Amino acid sequence: MGVVIGIDVGGSTTKIIGVENKSIQSPMFVKATDPVTSLFGAFGKYIYDNGITLPEIEMVMLTGVGSAFIDQPLYGLPTAKTDEFLANGLGAKYTASLENLIVVSMGTGTSFVKVEGPHIQHIGGLGVGGG
């Protein structure tokens, strides 16, 4: 099984992680004013800094407001998009090892997500801010 790359293309910052053997690897943050530039810059820097080759990448998962600008696979790799609130809920549940929690995501926008076991619900706020 290869590396899954997760990328949150935000309005001001792109966040990227790798997941290998169910372990989160080397979170990275990249700032750029253009989401496509930020995405490709973060992706290139991440795989270079971590010594990951393209054939080692199993999947690229995208989320965030900037992911709307991407309509084709990254470098021919399997690429999919997921809802940002779902990603926030699942990520927090996994990281915290909790079944029930409220997730507050504070960036240029602030959102609230409720996690109750397998159910994840956006309960308020926005994922997109004003800068």
Residue ranges of model-derived segments:
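Short glycine-aspartate micro-motif
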Residues: G2-D8, I57-M61, L101-S105, I123-G125
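Short glycine-rich, Thr/Ser-proximal phosphate-binding strand/loop in the N-terminal lobe
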Residues: V3-G41, I120
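A short acidic Gly-Thr/Ser loop motif
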Residues: D8-T13, V65, S105-G109, L126-G131
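Short beta-strand-loop/turn "lid" adjacent to the catalytic site in phosphate-handling enzymes
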Residues: F29-A32, F43, Y48-E84, G117-H122
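Generic structural signal for well-ordered, non-membrane alpha-helical segments
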Residues: A32-L39, K81, F85, L126, ...
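Generic hydrophobic alpha-helical segments
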Residues: L39-Y46, N88-A92
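Conserved phosphate-binding catalytic cores of ATP/NTP-utilizing and phosphoryl-transfer enzymes
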Residues: I70, Y75-V104, G109-H119
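Glycine-rich phosphate-binding loop plus the immediately following alpha-helix
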Residues: K93, P118-G131
